[in-house]
Amino acid sequence: MKTIRSMVLVSSDPVSMQNGAQAVFTRLQEEINGFGLQDEISLVMMGDVGRHDALPIVVVYPEAVIYGPVNPDQVHFLVEEHLYKGRIAADLLASSRELSGRIAWLAA
């Protein structure tokens, strides 16, 4: 039985797709496989994240780290640092300005 230790989500709304989300997703698959992590990492596309200034974004759980905007050339570093070595790839983090905004569960 496989034990998934991390889930990686890639935004796939229209703006993300226009900004290269599919290429980021494909490169993530390649790098995850290249590091032999395919049995430990779940990789999926997610819908609209409600932000359009840091797209595409990559979210890594269980840490809930948000990277963005991410381009395919940055994926090797992200996978090596965060998923392989277990360190936050600080250079790729989405800025706090891009993460601020209405919190969905507080908006009734």
Go through each PLM region and give its residues.
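Feature of Fe-S/electron-transfer and energy-metabolism proteins
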Residues: 1-108
